[in-house]
């Protein structure tokens, strides 16, 4: 069996690639990073290092690379016969690979390949695969859309594994935490007979996606923004500070109240899940930089993102969101010279009225009360 995977970066190699290889797949990695693609083609294998005592290694083989910038036709050829397509490239890049996937689907139709195929976007976003489907369908004619409706699935997925910023002499070596979770919405699959070991298949993915995004992503960002405000440079340093740890624990408590109100989770189950997350952030073998975890603050302030969405939903239910709101105030002070969004946000705050900036970044144009609360939080964080 073969898989075409878009994104040969650390998550692609260190999580999705590892899982696919462990399930017996050969992998065609697709990327524009020529250093990585060339190394994959020269060696056909790479190592993953687990961030645990002894730094256990996992060996991955039967892999190659395709530079989609130079050889888009090879990507189309690979999709024509592949058994699975996955992505780990970042939500904003999905639209750029959509034409290639569309051409691959057309090639399958032209070759009369009626083997069902699932395309799984493994991204930090809600509804990633369905978003990719919309982008792909915008490049399809009606007859190919009809073919895709019958044979091509776009099941949403939730993925979770911390892969810190890292540098190695070997461009293919990647260090990852031991914990990993990959959940796929089986109700959206076209090829449900192809199930991967260590991947969890659920009839409804939304509870798992929200649990992950509002716990891991919100929690990680909370440590970053609180730590930055206190002058720390790494997550590991920051979380040793009792103020940061308390902020994280109180945030997760607010998130628990929302998840319990919305979904069929058990309180003890969520408490254990959140304790595990705190332990992951405290892992001394993963040194993640606050600059990386906190980057793109404008995106992270989005209406459906990791802070504003849970705040909106907690407010609608009359539940507390005090700690989440405190962190939101700190995000507006995240001044990271190397991050373009951070610098754009600081310029907006200098040039525009604070409440206008809040509406622009959060999309809260219909909730003046919440905008006022955020403005107060921003001022309190001065």
From Swiss-Prot:
The answer to whether keyword NAD applies is yes
Q: Which GO terms describe its molecular function?
A: mannitol-1-phosphate 5-dehydrogenase activity
Which superkingdom? Bacteria
Indicate whether Oxidoreductase appears among the record's keywords. yes
- GO terms of biological process kind: mannitol catabolic process
This enzyme's EC code(s): 1.1.1.17
Binding of NAD(+) occurs at 3-14
What are the alphabetically sorted keywords of the record?
A: NAD, Oxidoreductase
Class of the enzyme per the UniProt entry, highest EC level: oxidoreductase
Swiss-Prot/TrEMBL catalytic activity: D-mannitol 1-phosphate + NAD(+) = beta-D-fructose 6-phosphate + NADH + H(+)
Q: Which InterPro entries match?
A: 6-PGluconate_DH-like_C_sf, 6PGD_dom2, Mannitol_1_phos_5_DH, Mannitol_DH, Mannitol_DH_C, Mannitol_DH_CS, Mannitol_DH_N, NAD(P)-bd_dom_sf
**GO CC, one annotated term:** cytosol
The UniProt similarity line reads:
Belongs to the mannitol dehydrogenase family.
Q: Which NCBIfam families match?
A: PRK02318.1-2, PRK02318.1-3, PRK02318.2-5
Protein's UniProt name? Mannitol-1-phosphate 5-dehydrogenase
Q: Which organism is it from?
A: Ligilactobacillus salivarius (strain UCC118) (Lactobacillus salivarius)
């Amino acid at each position: 069996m073969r898989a075409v995977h878009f994104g040969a970066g650390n998550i692609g190699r260190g999580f999705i690639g590892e899982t696919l290889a462990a399930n017996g797949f050969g992998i065609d990695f697709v990327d524009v990073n020529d250093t990585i693609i060339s190394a994959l083609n020269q060696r056909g294998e790479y190592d993953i290092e687990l961030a645990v005592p002894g730094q256990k290694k996992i060996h991955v083989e039967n892999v190659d690379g395709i530079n989609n910038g130079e050889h888009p036709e090879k990507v189309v050829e690979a999709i024509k016969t592949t058994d699975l397509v996955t992505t780990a490239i970042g939500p904003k890049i999905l639209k750029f690979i959509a034409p290639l996937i569309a051409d691959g689907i057309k090639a399958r139709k032209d070759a009369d390949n009626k083997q069902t195929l699932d395309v799984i976007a493994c991204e930090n976003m809600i509804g990633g695969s369905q978003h990719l489907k919309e982008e792909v369908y915008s490049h399809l004619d009606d007859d190919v859309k009809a073919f895709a409706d019958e044979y091509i699935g776009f099941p949403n997925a939730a993925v979770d594994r911390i892969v810190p910023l890292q540098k190695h002499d070997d461009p293919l070596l990647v260090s990852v935490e031991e914990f990993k979770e990959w959940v796929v919405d089986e109700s959206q699959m076209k090829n449900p007979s192809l199930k991967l070991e260590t991947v969890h298949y659920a009839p409804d993915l939304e509870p798992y996606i929200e649990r992950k995004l509002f716990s891991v992503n919100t929690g990680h960002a909370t440590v970053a923004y609180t730590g930055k405000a206190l002058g720390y440079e790494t997550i590991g340093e920051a979380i040793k500070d009792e103020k940061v740890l308390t902020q994280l624990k109180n945030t997760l408590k607010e998130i628990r109240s929302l998840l319990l109100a919305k979904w069929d989770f058990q309180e003890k189950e969520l408490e254990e899940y959140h304790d595990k997350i705190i332990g992951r952030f405290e892992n001394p073998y993963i040194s993640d930089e606050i600059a990386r975890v906190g980057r793109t603050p404008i995106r992270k302030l989005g209406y459906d993102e990791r802070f504003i969405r849970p705040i909106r939903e907690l407010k609608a239910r009359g539940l507390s969101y005090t700690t989440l709101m405190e962190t939101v105030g700190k995000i507006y002070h995240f001044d990271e010279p190397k991050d373009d969004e951070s610098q754009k946000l600081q310029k907006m705050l200098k040039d525009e009225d604070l409440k206008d900036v809040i509406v622009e970044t959060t999309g809260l144009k219909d909730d003046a009360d919440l905008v006022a609360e955020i403005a107060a939080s921003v001022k309190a964080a001065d």
